[in-house]
């Protein structure tokens, strides 16, 4: 069993070496997704990537498909990229504009930009005798537990509790300030066709090679 085999993860790391399972074992990877990536603050994107209402940008937080969207109220929302009805993916493209609302391609459920349910087609006849209650919050697109933006950089955490974004960033916040303060008007933006790399490796190998 996973919990029995890696109850003490420190055994995999020695003063002069790291066991290969840390980089190759799928169960350890799943535990890392659960305890690290789906718990801490994760960078989602920059506000300049979604300038207009309905603009969205899709991403991944740990194992969870997410999307960042600009609402009509100009607020930035980070939602799970799936319909609460049957789990169908809401937005398949990397980025785009969803128009007045999100619309699921499976059963045409519609949602506001903040993820709240807007309309269920044929609610009166098609869902008779079921437990579907249009007023239930469970029928809304699920939002990330916490969302914060620092100087246009949007972060989200799937954990409802934990350090604030500024506490999490710590001294690295100076790098954000330095980059923005050098830009005209103290703001930066992500321009179209930004350079993107997909690294087919364990995430730790990539991170260690950047240090």
Go through each PLM region and give its residues.
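Rieske [2Fe-2S] iron-sulfur-binding subdomain
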Residues: 1-75, 112-211
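Glycine-rich active-site/cofactor-binding loop and its immediate structural neighborhood
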Residues: 55-105
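Short, flexible active-site-adjacent loop segments at beta-strand->alpha-helix junctions, enriched
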Residues: 82, 108, 123
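Active-site HxH/HxHxD metal-binding segment of metal-dependent hydrolases
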Residues: 99, 109, 121
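Extended, hydrophobic alpha-helical segments in both membrane/secreted and soluble proteins
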Residues: 104-106, 111-113
């Amino acid at each position: 069993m996973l919990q029995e085999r890696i109850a003490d993860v420190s055994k995999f790391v020695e003063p002069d070496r790291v066991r290969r399972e840390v980089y190759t074992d799928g169960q350890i990877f799943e535990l890392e997704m659960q305890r690290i990536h789906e718990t801490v603050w994760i960078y989602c994107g920059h506000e300049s990537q979604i300038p207009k209402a309905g603009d969205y940008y899709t991403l991944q937080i740990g194992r969870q498909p997410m999307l960042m969207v600009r609402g009509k109220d100009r607020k930035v929302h980070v939602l799970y990229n799936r319909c609460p009805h049957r789990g169908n993916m809401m937005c398949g493209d990397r980025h785009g504009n969803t128009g007045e609302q999100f619309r699921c391609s499976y059963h045409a459920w519609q949602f506001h930009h903040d993820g709240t349910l807007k309309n269920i087609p044929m609610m009166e006849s098609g869902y008779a005798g079921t437990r579907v209650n249009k007023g239930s919050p469970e029928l809304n697109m699920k939002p990330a537990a916490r969302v914060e933006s620092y100087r246009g950089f949007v972060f989200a955490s799937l954990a409802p509790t934990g350090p604030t974004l500024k506490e999490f960033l710590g001294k690295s916040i100076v790098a954000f300030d330095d980059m923005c303060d050098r830009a005209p008007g103290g703001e930066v933006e992500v321009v179209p066709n930004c350079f993107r790399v997909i690294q087919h490796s364990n995430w730790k190998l990539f991170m260690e090679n950047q240090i």
